[in-house]
């Protein structure tokens, strides 16, 4: 492993960790940054799976007490049973649509221009959602009904379009469906666990031939970096949403998306995978 390859792994690990749980699209940022630093091919497919696992481990660690309480209480406690059922209900739409459409979406939509467009559109929707008057009827994740979970699960499917943001769609969807800001954010984190692990297992099996012993050091750098920066991002976001709205992320999405579109339109950057 040369120094530049290590630097690429470090950069992409940081990007994944910082963006995975913020409503700004980690997949979109990965596509853009990987394009800029010329990190692609079979190694990149396997590498992306590894750094996503690093990010999800950070959330598992951050919410380990809640997870342990649910696991211990699952046989007898109705609250734990309802929470688990809600996660399964919210998880299933992504499983069904992911298996059916994942390859098609990856082939046609994984490019810089799709990402930029989705960033802008998603940012506008976030601003609209934030400016609406919210009637909170669900204060905590334990108060959610199966209908709340199903609606959030359906909204999560929008994130199959790169640049949309899984966390952004589930959080904003939760707010529109009557969840408190804290409940919407926490449920988005919990839903990420089965969703991302399921996607990683599916992709890992599908691309199992791309995992090579020679790439272990690269994977290790990306995994550790992603874990550390995801932990920082999750803790920062939980503190941030206690006193702020998501408008700042919306404006960031719009500005970043427009910048990408401008560089493409004026030919300042030759995006390797750009499509009109």
Curated annotation (Swiss-Prot):
Catalytic reaction(s) noted: di-trans,octa-cis-undecaprenyl diphosphate + H2O = di-trans,octa-cis-undecaprenyl phosphate + phosphate + H(+)
GO MF annotation list: undecaprenyl-diphosphatase activity
Pfam families reported for this sequence: BacA
Membrane protein topology class: Multi-pass membrane protein
GO BP term (any one): peptidoglycan biosynthetic process
TM segment ranges: 43-63, 85-105, 109-129, 183-203, 218-238, 254-274
Miscellaneous comment: Bacitracin is thought to be involved in the inhibition of peptidoglycan synthesis by sequestering undecaprenyl diphosphate, thereby reducing the pool of lipid carrier available.
Name used for this protein in its record: Undecaprenyl-diphosphatase
Annotated source species: Pseudomonas syringae pv. tomato (strain ATCC BAA-871 / DC3000)
UniProt lineage: Bacteria, Pseudomonadati, Pseudomonadota, Gammaproteobacteria, Pseudomonadales
């Amino acid at each position: 492993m040369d120094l530049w390859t290590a630097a690429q792994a470090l950069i992409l690990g940081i990007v994944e960790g910082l963006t995975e749980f913020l409503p700004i699209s980690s997949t979109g940022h990965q596509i853009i940054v990987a394009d800029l630093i010329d990190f692609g091919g079979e190694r990149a497919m396997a590498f992306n799976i590894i750094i996503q696992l690093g990010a999800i481990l950070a959330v598992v660690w951050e919410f380990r007490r809640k997870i342990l309480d649910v696991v211990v209480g699952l046989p007898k406690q109705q609250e734990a049973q309802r929470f688990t059922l809600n996660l399964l209900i919210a998880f299933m739409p992504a499983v069904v649509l992911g298996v059916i459409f994942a390859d098609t979406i990856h082939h046609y939509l994984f490019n810089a221009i799709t990402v930029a467009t989705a960033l802008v559109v998603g940012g506008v929707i976030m601003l609209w959602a934030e400016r609406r008057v919210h009637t909170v009827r669900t204060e905590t994740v334990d108060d959610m009904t199966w209908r709340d979970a199903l609606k959030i699960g359906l909204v999560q499917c929008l994130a199959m379009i790169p640049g949309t943001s899984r966390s952004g769609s589930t959080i904003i969807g939760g707010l529109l469906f009557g969840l408190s800001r804290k409940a919407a954010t926490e449920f988005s984190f919990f839903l990420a666990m089965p969703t991302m692990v399921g996607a990683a297992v599916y992709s890992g099996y599908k691309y199992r031939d791309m995992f090579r012993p020679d790439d272990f050091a690269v994977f290790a750098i990306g995994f550790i970096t992603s874990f550390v920066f995801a932990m920082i991002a999750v803790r920062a976001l939980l503190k941030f949403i206690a006193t702020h709205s998501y408008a700042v992320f919306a404006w960031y999405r719009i500005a970043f998306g427009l910048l990408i579109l401008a560089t493409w339109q004026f030919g300042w950057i030759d995006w390797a995978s750009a499509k009109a």
